[in-house]
From Swiss-Prot:
Family the entry assigns: Belongs to the peptidase T1B family. HslV subfamily.
Gene: hslV
Protein name: ATP-dependent protease subunit HslV
Keywords: Allosteric enzyme, Cytoplasm, Hydrolase, Metal-binding, Protease, Sodium, Threonine protease
Principal EC category: hydrolase
Length: 176
């Protein structure tokens, strides 16, 4: 399990939101930063990514993904698959300890530093140390309330921050 962050993506109707907390943890017991931004817009704002894991590895994965998005004209699935294929062939890159959630108007993908691309069955996906807590909260809110995606994502992270010591309530949300 990767420590130090929680990222959640929530899709409902024609909207999708990605939210992340701001905590960066060093080792087992030191908080280095409270207000880190782990959510980014790519490809002229048409794609949102959120990353979890080792900071350097997550940034490397995000940068490589951005290059593939540019190369394949913003095609999210194609960029993810091409990145995964490159990743699996490179012995050094395969060892990256990072996960990335990437969304556009149509698709939600989980991309791992080990070269896997997964399209979730549900309209909600969570990663990072508090990902399962946030995902459970978001699923409950998604299917049992009239909240929009941004509010669901934010509330899910607030709940996760009360359970997971590696997640804080300094939340960034981006919506398409």
């Amino acid at each position: 399990m990767f420590k130090g962050t929680t990222i959640i993506a929530v899709r409902k109707g024609d909207k999708v939101s990605v939210a992340g907390d701001g905590q960066i943890t060093f080792g087992e017991n030191t908080i280095l930063k409270h207000g880190a931004k782990k959510i980014r817009r790519l490809y002229n704002g048409e794609v949102i990514v959120g990353f979890a894991g080792s900071v350097a590895d997550a940034l490397t994965l995000s940068q490589k993904f951005e290059e593939k998005l540019e190369q394949y004209g913003g095609n999210l699935k194609r960029a993810a698959v091409e990145l995964a294929q490159e990743w699996r062939k490179d012995k050094i890159l395969r060892k990256l300890e990072a996960l990335l959630i990437a969304v556009d108007k149509k698709d939600t993908l989980l991309i791992s530093g080990t070269g896997e691309v997964i399209e979730p069955d549900e309209d909600v996906i969570g990663i990072g140390s508090g990902g399962n807590y946030a995902m459970a909260a978001a699923l409950a809110l998604r299917y049992n309330t009239d909240l929009d995606t941004e509010d669901i994502a934010k509330k899910a992270l607030e709940i996760a921050s009360k359970i997971c010591v590696y997640t804080n309530n300094n939340i960034t949300v981006e919506t398409l």
